[in-house]
Amino acid sequence: LRAFRLSQAGMVIADALERGEELANGHEQLTTRLLQAGAVHPHLSEALKPEDITIVIPAFVRDSTDMSTLQKLTALFQNHPVIITDDASPLRIDVDGAVVIRHSTNRGPAAARNTALEKVSTTYVAFVDLDASITSDQLCCLGSLFKGADIGVVAPRVASQESASQLSHYEVVRSPLDMGVLPALIRPGSRVPYVPAAILLARTAIVRHVGGFNETMRYGEDVDLLWRLSDAGIMCRYEPQVTGVHTPRASLRKFFLQRFHYGLSAAVLAKNHRSYVAPFATNILMIGSLISVVACAPLFVGLFLLAQFVSSSVMLFRIGDDLAHACTTAIMNIVYSARTFADAVTRAWFWLFIILAIFFPSLRWIIAGSVVLPAVSQWSRHRAMNPLTFVVLRSIDNFSYCTGVWCGVLQQKSFAALVPKITVWWRRAG
């Protein structure tokens, strides 16, 4: 949570922003600050021209179905320069209207994108995966966000393509590529800490400046790129008003492996980026309350939560918030911490809690609650499928990811991906 203290003139500007009204003279300093903090977001405006965006498609074509998909995808970008990197596909790629570069050995998506990136001569480059789709008009519209020189990447929402299968219904609700309906500044530790490279639009020079994608990573290379850009002070934006689609995994085995590999990449990312990958981030008071829950000490749970509520409310009230809103925000902060703790229990820490539950029976209730309650809450907002099926698929999703995390931890010989990030107090800004 970030809070800002505003002058009277600043409050007038903030109110105008909230209502979508014309801004008063002298607003630039405040609006720039709010944009850089991710507190407000720019509107889509004048679109880029197709000839200014090169489309890069990393491709591994296994069969005629993949070839047909590639041809249809390329046909969407007839007015763009298109470069396809054939990453040693079993079928040789030959597509009209595209430059094809072939790797003699399979080097992975990061290397495939970098190979094509070297040949790009336009100001902007769009990376589009074979199993994703977006129109030329949508990409050009998305490019209107490149107004500020400090914006290096803009990304659309990547929704899951729905079909008749239960897996497809689940992916529509909980796809790992879909970052939601709200715009955001992409940065570590935020509501949108990363976006997938399934569809990504970037300034060519900026991606080259940071060295492109990390070719040593088979998975998580998109997250690594975005975090390196963030560390370099380059802004990356997520804009869900523009939405592409992605074909979800067709079988439970492929579904499991996808999540497993995402978990596997977490350990590599943690080695390179440390606390950015922390499965749980909170302050010392919330940690105290959670330890008290594990220890079955309800009195201390209440005391720690009360201290968290009072301290948060007072801090917000002191910087100018009204008391009722300060109290409501403090409660929301506690609820959010509980949810992220439940996510950590069922994802990164699942195996640890299963082992500990053998010796500490009270943890079984925490595991059960962390599995069932968030799943039911998420299902109730969509009701796209049978609730039991949703809970089971969500559990498989988390179990697959957790197994990948622990395998990655053992491979990297580092527990960084399992370590929570604990702060003494709330970060204060403004």
Question: Which stretches of residues belong to each language-model region?
Answer:
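N-proximal low-complexity "stem/linker" segments adjacent to membrane-targeting elements
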Residues: A3-L6, V12-A75
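Short aromatic/hydrophobic "clamp" motif used to bind/position activated sugar donors
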Residues: V125
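Conserved donor NDP-sugar-binding/catalytic core segment of glycosyltransferases
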Residues: D137-H169, T247
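Short, flexible, basic/aromatic active-site loop/helix in glycosyltransferases
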Residues: P156, E171-V192
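Acidic donor-binding loop at a coil-to-helix junction in glycosyltransferase catalytic cores
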Residues: Y219-L225, Q258-H261
